Structure formats: structure tokens, C-alpha cells
């Protein structure tokens, strides 16, 4: 029976992907060791209010069919950093212009969301088109590590039934 138990622990260990985080150790996609609960890898079956400003990142798989999508029209193109001041109507997605970034670098996105208590999906779009996001409200900041080289952009999606404002900044390093 000891061998079976040891084998079970070994199997669990091999299935666990541990990432050190400033807030402690967190297991992505398996069990969150610090909170003793499951952390989903994508946002298909979550309540966004449970993950606001937690620093937990998701693959953003929610459909955006029917959403209006608009690329920022500022003069800044291919910039490694930029400020933005966006007013996002309901069911709306806004993106920055594309910029080139190298794998092993990071994109940090931060800002302020108003009105108070409104939640936005804020994230990056990878060169392959995969969206990665956090759920944010109020003042927030998040660092997205990169594992691909190519064109990226920053985005925000408003799933609320009213206009939500996002004033912020992104930077790469």
C-alpha cells in the first residue's frame, strides 16, 4: 500500500506545473496551492467577479461575435510603450496598434477603470491571435510574460451594459 501511495504522489507531482509568483507559489491549471481550489486555464466557465484584480491570467476564449472591435487610431505605431484613454461602449473591444516584441520579454499593462466597480477584460493578443487576459476594476497593473516573438497588441473588452472608461499605459521590457 505504501508503494501505491508513493506512486500517486509521484503522478500528482508530475502533473503539477508550478510557477513562482510575487504573491507566493501558484499552480496554473491545476490546484492553487495557496487557496486550495481549482484555477481554470481559460475563462469559459468562470464568474469574473471571483477573479477581479487577483493577478490570475486566463486564455480568453469567450466569443466576441457581435462585439464592435476597433483599433486605436492614435499616431503611435509600433511603440514599445504608450498611454491610452479609452471610452468603451457595451459589447465593445478596443486594441492598440500592433507592435513587435521578442520572446522572453514582458508587456506590463496598468490603468484605472471607471465607473467604480465595473469589470473589464484587459490583456494582450499574441502573434498567433490567442488572447490572454485578466479581469480588472479600479486601479490595476499586470505583467504578461512572453514566449513568442512577433506582433502583439493590448486590448480591453467591455462586457458591461454601460460605457466603461479605461485610462492606462502599457510598456515592454
What is each model feature region?
Residues 132-137:
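Short beta-strand segments within Ig-like beta-sandwich modules, predominantly Fibronectin type-III
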Residues 105-107, 145-160:
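Noncatalytic modules at the cell exterior or secretory-pathway interfaces
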Residues 120, 160-173:
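Edge beta-strands of jelly-roll/beta-sandwich modules across compartments, strongly enriched
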Residues 88-103:
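Non-catalytic, beta-strand-enriched accessory regions in extracellular/secretory proteins
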Residues 104, 114-119, 160-161:
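Short proline/glycine-enriched turn/loop motifs at strand-loop junctions of beta-rich domains
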Residues 1-89:
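N-terminal prepro-regions of secreted/extracellular proteins
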Residues 117-130:
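Short, surface-exposed beta-strand/strand-loop-strand elements in extracellular ectodomains
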Residues 138-144:
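Short strand-edge motifs at loop-to-beta-strand transitions and within beta-strands
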Amino acid at each position: 500500500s505504501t508503494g501505491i501511495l508513493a506512486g500517486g504522489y509521484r503522478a500528482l507531482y508530475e502533473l503539477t506545473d508550478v510557477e513562482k509568483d510575487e504573491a507566493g507559489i501558484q499552480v496554473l491549471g491545476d490546484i492553487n496551492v495557496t487557496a486550495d481550489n481549482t484555477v481554470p486555464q481559460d475563462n469559459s466557465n468562470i464568474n469574473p467577479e471571483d477573479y477581479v484584480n487577483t493577478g490570475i491570467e486566463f486564455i480568453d476564449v469567450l466569443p466576441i461575435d457581435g462585439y464592435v472591435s476597433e483599433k486605436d487610431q492614435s499616431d503611435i505605431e509600433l511603440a514599445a510603450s504608450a498611454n491610452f484613454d479609452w471610452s468603451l461602449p457595451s459589447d465593445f473591444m478596443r486594441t492598440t496598434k500592433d507592435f513587435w516584441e521578442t520572446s522572453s520579454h514582458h508587456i506590463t499593462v496598468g490603468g484605472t477603470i471607471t465607473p467604480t466597480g465595473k469589470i473589464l477584460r484587459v490583456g494582450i493578443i499574441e502573434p498567433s491571435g490567442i488572447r490572454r487576459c485578466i479581469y480588472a476594476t479600479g486601479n490595476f497593473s499586470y505583467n504578461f510574460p512572453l514566449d513568442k516573438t512577433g506582433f502583439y497588441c493590448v486590448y480591453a473588452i467591455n462586457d458591461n451594459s454601460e460605457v466603461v472608461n479605461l485610462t492606462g499605459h502599457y510598456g515592454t521590457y
